């Protein structure tokens, strides 16, 4: 093979495959332009434009899902089109849309630049979508940086609030540190996959093909370990979770809601694709090949991480008196539950089982996004401008003064707990069943015990709302129309996904995941 031809091959440019991402990026630029020329009383237009852009991206994604019959890859394998990408894209669009609804009145009340915020949100959404569609480690990193840079700014968007500034700085410093781990891991894998005739590769499918003949196994192990650390930070797993409570508490509540659902799902999308498809289970050589040893190593590491993440998240959440910090530790615990499904996918012995486990993880993250955003929407209403009321005692007796808000928050908390007939219950059933199918009985028992532990702090807040009397004056807040719409959507989602999950699950399984041989 001609080396120059290999290095400088013309890329197979196919803009149709990245149409949703192009729409989101174009809307991000358009929102900035509109904001620059709009009158102060017309700044709400930027939120409407962003919602239209998300709707257009959703339509284009649906078209790709239902009617696209072209190539499943583009740009020389940098972008892929499969169930994993499209399923996560749907989650990202839902998360961003709900975040806009929650934030439209918030930016007005805080006297912040609505156009800047919504534009940053659009670019963060594009970054998440690129992470899910990445077929190459370089694309994973580019998508991650687009997402991270936008999110750093959003955390510090309340410029006059020292807590917001501290949140942004902590996230920036620790996020940069984790990105360095990820990038160095990519560099090591590139070097380890080089041969005498071919340069190294960062293409995920090509890495899997070269594993049996890898000449530098220690570099591969080191690279995989560093990427595990990088992804662990992004999805807030123990012991890489220490940034989460401070950042979530200090960031503006709509930003916290977005970060707890969107970037976490994006991290899982890339994490799944890289470790399941670059280091897959290969039956015939599982015990004596480089790929088999790497697979066994990361799977064992994930089991330990999942147990630590579920346990630490739930135990520390019990001691929290700030609702945002409590939900931050809850977010850590839910990352552990999602890892249970990830482990099941990694241990699957055939493609059908692997795809079923991947679907379980996607469904779980969808349910978590819906109920988590709903909970933060209520927290935002109660906290009011400046996030002044976020302590547990601020919720004393609101079940009598604002019964609708108390009912909504109670429903979301019960769903986060995993009560039957709610989305959270079906999400946990899916990931736990996938783990049981692979024989991880002890892991599932630990997950169920952690669910029981989480009942303490979820039910505690419900008890405070309905069985405690207020000791301070408090007037029931008005629910803005946009936030009311977000609450209606999330309540519908919690009930629909809990009562009729099969329809969503079947849709997620309609398009096969990127094929990797499991010979």
Can you name each region flagged by the protein language model?
Residues 1-519:
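Alpha-helical transmembrane segments of multi-pass membrane proteins predominantly involved
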């Amino acid at each position: 093979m001609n080396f120059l031809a290999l290095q400088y091959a013309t890329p197979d440019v196919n803009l149709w495959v990245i149409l949703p991402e192009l729409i989101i990026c174009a809307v991000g630029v358009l929102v900035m332009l509109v904001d620059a020329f709009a009158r102060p009383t017309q700044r709400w237009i930027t939120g409407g434009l962003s919602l239209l852009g998300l709707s257009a991206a959703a339509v284009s994604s649906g078209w790709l899902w239902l009617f696209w019959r072209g190539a499943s890859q583009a740009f020389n394998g940098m972008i892929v089109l499969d169930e994993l990408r499209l399923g996560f894209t749907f989650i990202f669009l839902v998360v961003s849309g709900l975040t806009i609804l929650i934030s439209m009145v918030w930016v007005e009340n805080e006297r912040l630049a609505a156009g800047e915020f919504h534009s940053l949100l659009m670019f963060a959404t594009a970054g998440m979508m690129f992470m899910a569609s990445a077929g190459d480690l370089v694309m994973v990193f580019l998508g991650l940086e687009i997402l991270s840079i936008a999110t750093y700014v959003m955390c510090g968007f309340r410029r006059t609030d020292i807590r917001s500034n501290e949140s942004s700085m902590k996230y920036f410093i620790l996020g940069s540190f984790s990105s360095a781990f990820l990038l160095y891991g990519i560099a090591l894998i590139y070097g380890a996959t080089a041969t005498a005739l071919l340069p190294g590769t960062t293409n995920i499918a090509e890495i899997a093909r070269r594993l049996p003949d890898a000449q530098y196994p220690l570099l591969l192990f080191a690279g995989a370990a560093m990427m595990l650390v990088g992804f662990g930070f992004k999805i807030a797993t123990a012991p890489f979770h220490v940034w989460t409570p401070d950042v979530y508490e200090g960031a503006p509540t709509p930003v916290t809601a977005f970060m707890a659902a969107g970037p976490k799902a994006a991290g899982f999308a890339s994490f799944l694709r890289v470790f399941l498809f670059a280091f897959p289970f290969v039956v015939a050589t599982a015990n004596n090949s480089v790929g088999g040893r790497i697979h066994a190593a990361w799977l064992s590491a994930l089991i330990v991480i999942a147990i630590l993440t579920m346990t630490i998240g739930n135990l520390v959440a019990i001691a929290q008196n700030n609702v945002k910090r409590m939900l931050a530790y809850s977010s850590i615990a839910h990352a552990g539950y999602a890892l249970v499904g990830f482990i099941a996918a990694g241990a699957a012995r055939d493609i059908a089982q692997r795809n079923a486990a991947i679907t379980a993880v996607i469904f779980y993250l969808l349910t978590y996004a819906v109920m988590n955003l709903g909970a933060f929407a209520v927290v935002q209403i109660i906290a009011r401008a400046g996030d002044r009321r976020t302590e547990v005692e601020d919720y004393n007796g609101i079940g009598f003064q604002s019964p609708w808000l108390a009912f909504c928050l109670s429903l979301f908390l019960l769903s986060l707990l995993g009560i039957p007939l709610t989305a959270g219950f079906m999400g946990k059933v899916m990931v736990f069943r996938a783990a049981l199918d692979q024989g991880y009985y002890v892991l599932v028992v630990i997950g169920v015990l952690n669910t029981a532990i989480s009942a303490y702090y979820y039910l505690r807040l419900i008890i405070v709302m309905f069985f405690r009397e207020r000791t301070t004056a408090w007037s029931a807040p008005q629910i803005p129309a946009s936030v009311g719409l977000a609450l209606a959507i999330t309540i519908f989602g919690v009930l629909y996904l809990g009562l009729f999950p099969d329809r969503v699950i079947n849709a997620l399984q309609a398009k096969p995941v990127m094929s990797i041989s499991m010979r």
